[in-house]
């Protein structure tokens, strides 16, 4: 839970930087400072690298960078909790891809209903109070696709390279995103105040959550960890309400609940399959 709280706090803080350096500049801060922190911790230069590992590392890092860039752009117009819920459909799709039990299709139905409740599009107004910006929705869905690819590619990278893939992937992600940040924010990225906030975002959104998740994975069953991770949309909605004063309708809260239920159910049935096997 600590990792979820710090991650959501970091993302809420990130949104406060958007008026000054944009979503692109904020993403650049997060990835550059996260790279420096992870490099200092893992010291990947101790490992012997080969050129044959470069293609999969580039795919891994590029996917990570684009995922962060799309998600932060989604946050410009979509409430935090809803953006997380939409993005969650990516890993949920990966988890359900190989589903065979009839119960697994219940989680698919719940996720589809939840997305249906989120997706009223068009201009928000009296006749359409739950409407969301379609561009923001597209960004969040794109981030979900990247998250799904990140999981699939990440499994291969982890098997081949291990923990050193994390700092190297983050380095590639930073290299991919930095041109966008410079293009939008320019010299504003060198503002010391914004840089310090960017460092705080990297700590809260990457370094601290990653450390806590690594500790949790060592001390919690994988199924329990996955179920706790499913609480992220709710924590995000709460953080958005407390920090950003974002208000969600009852329909949108129900949508978040359905997607969370689908994610938890998928984690539980996956755990049962592993026990059976």
Predicted feature locations:
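C-terminal-most transmembrane helix of multi-pass membrane proteins
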Residues: 31, 194, 230-277
């Amino acid at each position: 839970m600590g990792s979820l709280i710090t991650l959501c706090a970091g993302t809420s803080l990130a949104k406060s930087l958007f008026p000054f350096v944009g979503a692109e500049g904020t993403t650049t801060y997060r990835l550059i400072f996260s790279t420096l922190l992870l490099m200092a911790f893992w010291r990947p230069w101790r490992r012997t690298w080969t050129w044959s590992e470069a293609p999969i590392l580039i795919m891994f890092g590029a996917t990570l960078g684009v995922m962060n860039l799309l998600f932060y752009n989604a946050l410009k117009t979509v409430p935090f909790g809803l953006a997380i819920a939409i993005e969650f459909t990516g890993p949920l799709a990966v988890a359900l891809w190989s589903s065979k039990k009839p119960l697994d299709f219940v989680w698919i139905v719940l996720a589809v209903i939840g997305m249906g409740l989120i997706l009223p599009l068009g201009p928000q107004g009296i006749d359409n109070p739950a409407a969301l910006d379609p561009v923001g929705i597209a960004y969040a869905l794109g981030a979900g696709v990247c998250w799904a690819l990140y999981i699939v590619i990440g499994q291969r990278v982890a098997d081949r390279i291990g923990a050193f893939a994390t700092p190297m992937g983050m380095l590639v992600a930073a290299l991919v995103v930095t041109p966008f940040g410079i293009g939008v924010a320019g010299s504003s990225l060198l503002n010391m105040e914004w840089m310090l906030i960017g460092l705080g975002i990297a700590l809260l959104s990457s370094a601290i959550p990653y450390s806590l998740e690594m500790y949790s994975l060592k001390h919690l069953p994988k199924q329990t960890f996955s179920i706790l991770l499913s609480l992220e949309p709710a924590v995000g909605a709460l953080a958005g309400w407390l920090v950003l004063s974002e208000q969600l309708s009852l329909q949108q809260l129900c949508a978040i609940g359905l997607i969370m239920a689908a994610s938890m159910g998928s984690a539980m049935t996956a755990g049962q399959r592993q026990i059976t096997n």
